[in-house]
């Protein structure tokens, strides 16, 4: 299968990135500095990520608001033009989370038409287009995420308008004569922005941000950062057979909205109660539990790990997993990793 390539692939190769397949795209998993160094750069300074593999669906004009409102779980009436919102697309039959999505609602003047950029996970873009219509715009732009406690300070030297965009705000910002859409969003648990830049201008913007001293980081660090922050990954904590309630994301569902796809099934589960719920686990030692490892309480297998890895900040392993809903914080668990028992304790994410 021919992999999709980021508009920034030449820049990654010039930096000697380790490129791997991810969601049908050839993307950097790490640079020579390594995942741990990249992770810590984001936690303590600033890092930049190419996330151009994320989908982008443009939906605009009359009826756009109503279509999104009738499809996704969250309530767009809670926000306004110039804001971003996290939401879910559910399966109508069982309320499984088909995708978790960020919506960027472009700023507009009174009387101007609404413009939304709906950003699904890479492998789910076609399904989202089928659900809401619109025009796929993934290949018209690159997306550069600049994240970390020093991200905005360092980015301001290169792109001050983008650095000024607030958390969950959306703005159109000009860089060297090119309009970029900038959202105060991310997937690391740190402050920062994501910049959607037209393909032709993307390499120059990437190189300018690198030259400002911000550390390039791969998808390996992005994954360990989101895990430390307790953020779900579609295909692991979300997906077929996993609902918003089970993933401990009931806040993403606007229960008072009169209609959205999967509403009846979601309400039925809320009424009946969930059979399992997502928990965090701190694990003794550095060895990580991996997806699918069995979790036991008092010698009985009661669940399994969905994500696990070493936490560079904490210095030991952490995990997420589904367990019975009555499981309590502080409870001791054991995890079977290829016949070796790891000892852990239940916590409520985030881990850091």
What is each residue range found by the language model?
Residues 1-23, 27-30, 105-352:
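Conserved, structured C-terminal
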Residues 1-89, 96, 220:
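Acidic, proline/glycine-enriched N-terminal capping motif
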Residues 50, 100, 194:
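Acidic active-site catalytic centers that drive phospho-/nucleotidyl reactions
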Residues 55, 59, 93, 116-123:
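Short coil/turn segments at secondary-structure boundaries
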Residues 62-99, 149-178:
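Internal amphipathic helical hairpin motif
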Residues 78-81, 89-96, 101-112, 121, ...:
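Short, charge-rich binding segments
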């Amino acid at each position: 299968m021919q992999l999709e390539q980021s508009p920034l692939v030449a820049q990654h190769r010039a930096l000697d990135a380790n490129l791997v397949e991810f969601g049908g795209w050839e993307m950097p998993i790490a640079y020579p500095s390594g995942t741990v160094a990249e992770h810590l750069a984001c936690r303590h300074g600033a890092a930049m990520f190419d996330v151009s593999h994320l989908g982008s669906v443009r939906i605009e004009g009359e009826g756009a608001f109503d279509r999104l409102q009738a499809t996704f779980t969250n309530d767009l009436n809670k926000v306004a033009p110039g804001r971003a919102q996290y939401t879910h697309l559910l399966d109508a039959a069982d309320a499984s989370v088909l995708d978790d999505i960020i919506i960027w609602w472009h700023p507009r003047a009174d009387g101007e038409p609404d413009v939304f950029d709906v950003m699904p996970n890479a492998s789910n873009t076609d399904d989202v287009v089928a659900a809401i219509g619109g025009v796929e715009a993934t290949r018209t732009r690159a997306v550069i995420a600049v994240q970390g406690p020093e991200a905005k300070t360092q980015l301001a030297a290169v792109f001050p308008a983008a650095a000024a965009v607030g958390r969950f705000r959306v703005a159109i910002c000009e860089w060297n004569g090119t309009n970029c859409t900038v959202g105060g969003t991310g997937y690391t648990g740190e402050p920062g922005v994501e910049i959607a830049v037209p393909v032709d201008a993307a390499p120059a913007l990437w190189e300018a941000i690198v030259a400002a001293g911000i550390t390039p980081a791969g998808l390996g660090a992005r994954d360990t950062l989101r895990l430390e922050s307790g953020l779900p990954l579609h295909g692991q904590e979300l997906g077929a057979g996993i609902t918003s309630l089970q993933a401990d994301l009931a806040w993403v569902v606007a229960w008072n909205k009169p209609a959205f796809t999967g509403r009846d099934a979601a309400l039925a589960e809320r009424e009946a109660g969930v059979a399992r719920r997502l928990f965090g686990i701190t694990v003794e030692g550095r060895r990580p539990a991996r997806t699918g490892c069995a979790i036991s309480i008092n010698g009985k297998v009661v669940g399994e790990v969905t994500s696990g890895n070493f936490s560079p900040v904490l210095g030991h392993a952490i995990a997420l997993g589904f367990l019975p809903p009555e499981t309590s914080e502080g409870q001791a668990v054991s995890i079977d990793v290829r016949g070796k028992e790891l000892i852990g304790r239940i916590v409520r994410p985030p881990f850091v």
